[in-house]
Amino acid sequence: MDNALCYLQHLKDERQFIFGILNDNVREINIAKKEIKQLREYVGILQQNGFTGEALVSQMEYSMKIKKIKKLSSQYDINSAENSSGPYDFSFIGNELTIFRERLSNYSSWGVMHSIPSMPESIYIYMNPIHQTDEVDIVYQGSNDNYSYLIKKNGRTASYEHQITLNLAKDAVKKHNLREATKQRIVNNRKVNFITKYTEVTTNGKTDQLAVPLFLLHLVKTATGYKVSYITIKIILEEQVESNVNIVEIDTGVEMTNAEVNAIITGLLSRMMMVTNFVLGNSMVHRRMLRQFIGMQVKVIEGAYVINSQKGAGSNLLSGMYGQGVIATLSSLATLLESTPQTVKPNYVLNGIHTNDIEQKEYEVSSILKYTTNKSKDRKVGLAERISNINKPYSVTMTLGKGNGGILAIREYSALKFNYDYPDQLDDIIPSNADSSRPDAVRMTMTKTQSNNDIKITTTVHIILDITDYKDKKVSEGVIHTTLRKSGIYVKLEAIHNQTRSEAPGSLGGTDSLVSTTLCGIAQVHSKTSALSELSNNGGVDFFDGDDVKRDNNMCTNRKNFCVKFTTTSRSSPSVTLDIKSLGKRYKGNFPMIIQRVVDLTGREAWAYEAQLSSITMDNVQLRFGSKQEISIKETSQQFVYDDNGIIKVKYEKTLSGSVLKDGSKITTVIPDQKFNSINDIDNILTSRNQRNLRHRDVPWTGANNATAKYNGFRDDGMWGRKESGLMQYNNEDDVIIPIAFLGYTTSGSGGSRYILREYDIERAQQLMHTITRRDRSNTRQGQKNIYVRDGTSSGGYVANWHAMKTSMYMSLPGKNIMIKNVEINDIQELVLPNGVYDQILLSATNITLWNSVLILNQYVVYIKELAEDNARRLDVVEKTLNKVIELHQTMTVTPEETAQEESGWDIAGRIFTMLGAVVGMFFPIIGASIEVLGLVATGVGSIQQGHIVNGSLELTLAGVATVIGGYKLQKRLRQKYTLEGIKDSIKIKMDKLKEKFGTRVKNTHIGKEDSNNGVSTSTNKRSIGKANNTLTGTTDIEIVNDVINGQSAHITKTTYSQISPELQDCYRELDALLELTGNVEHWPSGLNLATAFDIRLTEKIDKIGKGKMSINAIVHGEQRTAEVNDAVWSKCVGVKANVEDYTIIRSAYVDTVQKEEMINVDRDIIRDIYTANGTKIVEKTSVGINSNNVNGKEYTVTQDGDISQLEHVITSGTVNDQSMQLIIQRCVLYYSELSSSPSD
């Protein structure tokens, strides 16, 4: 009896435990409701402040991600080895890093840093070539507290044209004739031998140095993902440290713990590894190469502080954020080493930012990976600690054959460099030690040296690149001919040109100091169809020397330039020819060759040739050209603006609510409601409203008068362009120029120092948009004007460029999250998702999942080839998941009467839908979500509201997946073990069987199972437990109706829970609401039956406290379920949950959209827009085609002309059969393929 009483008390305690969990869930629901309410209010506030379209979406995305990081950090153990095998490496979202970021946010009054990984912008860092015939001295002068260098040429202080780039790799020191003392001080085993850029000495007696290890700059940007251009890195020159452990000293003006330092390092390294996986594909050589860099020695990385440092102002970087005019992006690496930061002022920054009257200190770059740790058993070893074995000093050289060697930059591209000083020596780029089995291979070598006292270990990694069409390894007439192979690499040609002061149309004069950082512009070939066809038709694009060729459209008037000729031999085998011979006659130096992979909409390689041109001028560093990936679009009545993340559409006949800029910026200026027919009308409106500063064309141009310059306005492809003489121009009138950024300069006059601010935080940028003013600069030459972002505190201001106002921070990655919750916008045309999955997408009242799928299939084909070919790790995960699908499918073929399982075939079907959604969602997240919605509908789990019914999406989705991956390795590999048709048919057969058995009403019953030890029969027949009113029964009425696509679909007519314990009824009702609101993401595995999911949650909770596995029924209703019971259902449920959670992070944002209030919908308007935008029409063929493709006896096909109304007929008539829709899908893909490869007429 005592035992029985104890057991009853035990059950009572367990029940209290369960109710505690339920109450927690209710609280979570209320919090979720509150958050949604706040979110809607927030959207309203944003709209009232002018945020619309992309700006609104980006702001919403930013806000939601800040909240989500807290949940992510709690859900993921960042140091767990298991998590590293997931689709992303989330180790950088550690609790420590979260704490650190939140702490930093207290000192940065405009928000926490972004927390979702993103690919960095191109980091254009260039070396200024040293004239080989000149002897260059770098004279060390200064004391232990203040290191400075004089750069002398032939014994004289260097003039402006003689900026110098030091390649501090050991072998390169000799080439530059450096003095021995300098060599010993800078290049030794304890110093990191990266290329370091120095500016020259000015003539007014002040010394302005720029010392930035270029690769470290790239590392910071890549690791943080923050769009911060100006991160300066101090090189510490100090005496030998006695201890072998160099403690990382990081000072943000606030106390930091070792864990926070650990988090910073871990975030840095994990992001580097993540970027490696995506950028460098499956090349283990590349990955090995990058892992070498992870061991680099970093002690101080100073963040992008941009300070209005008039004399005596802003000395403390972290005090008076607005009062001192500090505009900074505190990345996770934005730290200062000095113990007294208020005495430190930055005196060197990149790309036009400059300060004056600043004390200079340089520091040794030392290890960040060795630090003291507490190895207690309750602490998990961090990533930084695990890789501490590679933290030794090393040098890096990357050489292409016998050229000058040295590493130019390792950004998101691989970088090569070869020397073209002497065209007759160009065959040197073929290494003598080339792989004998691959005679056409060029080898790039990276060497890492690990030094331990007197022992040095050198590791060399070779990166092989194919270069063909060499005649016996000889290059005739100095022309390098590189065939771009199928591996997805294209050549980006870069060249640097330094200006002399005398070449500038105006000079700074007086005591103005100039930051002579070489700035390279980028010009890209654009056409109505594709860069490839443009090159084919025009025989290449020439960039002529302004001194040799005079044209109306010449680029670089009165400026020395260089000649680059692009030619193509065939569309199937594109190539780039660089006329080095003519180049070498006039110009000596290193010509960097950048290799990048680009994929177009069809999954093929897109060869968007582009040359990078320098555009520095002495009087004002003003302009840079930008290039984006070319996406071929036919000319229509629409106009387009390209950005990193897709296409922004501008319709002339529509009323705009804002002006859209080339680089994706959204200037939230409201244009009066009126129709306009040309860009000139917009121009007039903006001008009349004194908002000329919001237009791209107001970027200053050297050699042009803004007041009289005429512009072409939108080109055929929507870019901004002009014909008048400017800094640089294309020669071909169809080509366009894209000014996306300009730089300000500094002056030591009474106006104080002025700085350019590039690419800073979204929220701050949007705040500043409202305070942009335009005013003239009295000391600006040639009447040029700059745009200032005022902080309202002093006469100084900040020059902001358009790139800084870019509102979308994240580039597209496979499986990238989109987070949109209840977005309400004024103009339905303006919503543009930020990650380029769609050309455009609208929220509307209806949901046409069919076209949702068509859009995804057309857009995501960009990524599927890369994933299928380059990511074996993900493929393994997919295969494991599909194994689970097959396992569930096999289980599903057993009827409930044949097994002791406590769920019906419908439950298993729902889980198959869930798992299938998880698999598909890895590549097509929205389709994966749609499959899960279909699973909810078909299996009667969850409550589906009107308008959310998915008609036949499973058939289309599976067929679409097969279409997309057709011909690639993934399909070939999967076909060996699974067939999509087989899975699809099996599910259909089982559903048919269930319909035969249950009719159109399926009763879904969940009843607990009893242990025979208690004397209860173990018969497989369903039976209730205890009293009737304690039986937990869920009943779902499913109506099977005909479907316009595949003839059948399931609709939920009613879902009820009957005979539930009264104390549980409200809880289940709340949980239903929670499922609708959150899409199951944060709380339950998607698609599982509610009660099953509930049991899983409770079972796991109970497991944690060692009470054994017990069902919710058994616990709540006082029935015993011992831990010894080997119940397949529960173990399977738990297994499913674990498997699903692996993909929850990827799919969460997409599933979030499948909720009660809003879904991502596509209606006829967007269909019309998509097809119109691409010049695609649906036309009725005059003759009847194949019967299987007929619609009411008429065949509809996709062509490049015709009446769009036929497409509407296909959609609205309800007569489309599955074959015709497949035809449309296939033709869409074919159309993109033809568009990117066919020549332009």
UniProtKB/Swiss-Prot annotation:
The chain crosses the membrane at residues 261-281, 918-938, 947-967. Residues 1005-1028 are annotated as: Disordered. Residues 21-49 form a coiled coil. One of its GO terms (cellular component) is host cell membrane. Its main location: host cell. It is a multi-pass membrane protein. It is found in: Host membrane. The keyword Coiled coil applies. It comes from the Viruses. Residues 1013-1028 have a biased composition (Polar residues). Keywords: Coiled coil, Host membrane, Membrane, Transmembrane, Transmembrane helix. The keyword Coiled coil applies. This is Uncharacterized protein S3. It comes from Diadromus pulchellus idnoreovirus 1.
